[in-house]
Regions:
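A short, charged helix-loop
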Residues: 131-137
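A short hydrophobic/small-residue beta-strand
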Residues: 29, 187-188, 262
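Conserved SAM/SAH cofactor-binding pocket of Class I
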Residues: 139-226
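Short structural boundary motif marking the start of a folded domain
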Residues: 2-4, 131, 300
Length: 310
């Protein structure tokens, strides 16, 4: 079975109308893509940014209804494109596939620093004797493929984590917290604003047999836990974005013991100095680090040690 796709390019002000018209016409799926090259970084809660020009793609099951025969689909495409003032539109066919398998085929094991591997749960570990972090990459952000995650994983693999308490703030899939436990940490407290991330973290901890040493919270739950358990962290990991990292600087100072270590990621080069300025009163920072390859060199990592108590 094949599916028909209708693509149209329109300004973001027309996207809502395009979605409504596609839905009314019987689309089984609608996808929004950037029509140009305008990056959008992860939004804050409640924000739903869009690109200035958007390609809206609707997928239709034209095999299930004889009314799609002949020129009906072409006429529908032209009508909707006209109503939303699309700058262009086009039609394509999409062959049916086992989409679950198709998605899974993009993930392969990743070797990080030292002896740490990230292994999708449906694949065998390339080196059974290594430290293998088994991951379901589909649950939340944090697969090991993104440079920001690998920067933190490589940093963790270089630390002595034995018997350490680690706080992973903005835990996503839980990959950093689970890695810390596999590398010897005593306990991880993982925090995220997204309930799906909290669930993903717990599930990935269970996949790796470390769920008895990892607690995952929404922020309000974490605050309540801290009230009853006011212990300070030996290590804080935060792979989020520059703006929240800057805002969290005083909180992380309060959570981290003197002499404790912190690693921050999710920064592009032109944001790094602002984050340095926010943390310098609290932390002695190392030189920013980035990978040398062209694809990932714009992502930077900051790390340091808490040495003051302002």
């Amino acid at each position: 079975m094949s599916w028909q796709q209708l693509h149209l390019q329109c300004p973001k002000s027309a996207v809502e109308l395009a979605e409504a018209l596609f839905d009314e016409a019987g689309a089984v799926s609608i996808l929004l893509e950037d029509a140009g090259d305008e990056p959008l970084f992860e939004p804050m809660p409640g924000e739903e940014p869009l690109w200035r020009d958007v390609v809206v793609t609707a997928i239709f099951d034209t095999n299930s209804d004889d009314s799609w025969a002949g020129t009906h689909f072409e006429n529908l495409a032209a009508k909707i494109a006209s109503e939303v003032n699309a700058t262009r539109f086009w039609l394509t066919s999409l062959d049916d596939k086992d989409w679950t398998r198709e998605w899974m085929s993009y993930y392969q094991p990743i070797q990080c620093a030292g002896n740490l591997w990230i292994v999708p749960e449906w694949l065998p570990a390339p080196d059974p004797a290594a430290i293998n972090l088994i991951l379901d990459p589909g649950l939340a952000f944090g697969t090991g493929y993104h440079a920001t995650t690998r920067l933190c994983l490589d940093w963790l693999a270089a630390q002595e984590l034995s018997d350490k308490l680690v706080i992973d703030y903005g835990c996503g899939s839980g990959i950093l917290g689970v890695a810390a436990l596999l590398l010897g940490a005593r306990q991880v407290l993982a925090v995220d604003i997204d309930p799906q991330a909290v669930l993903a973290t717990r599930q990935n901890a269970a996949l790796n047999g470390v769920d008895d040493r990892l607690l995952a919270f929404l922020p309000a739950e974490f605050d309540a836990y801290r009230t009853q358990n006011p212990q300070l962290a030996d290590v804080i990991t935060a792979n989020i974005l520059a703006k929240p990292l800057i805002g969290f600087a005083p909180l992380f100072h309060d959570l981290l013991k003197t002499g404790g270590l912190i690693v921050l990621a999710g920064l592009i080069k032109n944001q790094t100095q602002a984050v340095i300025d926010a943390y310098s009163p609290y932390v002695t920072l190392d030189t920013p680090f980035c990978y040398a390859d062209a694809q990932d060199c714009h992502w930077q990592r900051l790390s340091g040690i808490k040495s003051t108590n302002p």
